[in-house]
């Protein structure tokens, strides 16, 4: 809160300062007073004084399209946008309404015209036609945006807050979505939700990153990769040619803040990630890994559906008692309601109105 960017970003500051344009995801509102909403999952928020460190770290753009930006209601979001504006930092991915949240941010960097789109999966932060929030993932709207605005930019970057927590590979659907965005004219798609370092790929001339990991997130976690992540460096030319590099780091372990990995750890990290990333070119591998991951999550999600508390969720993982409540016929009905687009829309509308 004192604006001590050196104590927070340590040797990553050199990379921030060397960049012509620095973009970060702010996964919580900047607040003066708490005004938490009713939602599933943790409610996050930090003091408005934290803007000092972001400004002093030479951050140019803050992405607000994520699942926590509305955690402290419309008041928290509006406060965040105001504080960023007063600090001279651009924001993207959220706004006063759906149209405002979906605006492409235009940045001129030397001779290169860069367009930044920021999009979030549907959670408790989404803007509507008349209410503030984050820009939702809507592929039809994405295509419209690209048709109407693509020619205005030399380079289009999409920041997608999507993916499965603690899963380093893309799901089959996420990979399809990101690849389609490249096919429609995006030059880079950067996903930022997994809380662990994710794979990347070069696809039809564009770059896709399936998760960068946490940058500054000092919450305690037993997840192995919680304290690891990487910056994405894009080297862009006006004619559209580009190159991508990654800068691995350690964050919020026994020391506060974030710092680059030492040379040996960085080389090992890059090697492992490169090998993992090579595997996702094989669609069958992506599908097989996803099925295995979901198989291991079966009883977690069945507990969620039945509203179990933490104790019952843990017990269900051990003894699988939720199997007693779901016959094959009941599972088929559940699948039908979730899988069918029209039925899913009905269910979502009912729950949203409750």
Please state what every model-predicted region is:
Residues 1-65, 71-73:
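N-terminal catalytic scaffold of extracellular/periplasmic and nuclease hydrolases
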Residues 231-354:
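A short C-terminal boundary segment appended to hydrolase-like catalytic domains
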Residues 58-61, 172-231:
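Conserved beta-sheet core of the metallophosphoesterase superfamily
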Residues 24, 64, 68, 117, ...:
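Divalent metal-coordination and catalytic microenvironments
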Residues 1-10, 44, 108-156, 176, ...:
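Binuclear metal-dependent hydrolase catalytic cores centered on His/Asp/Glu-rich metal-binding motifs
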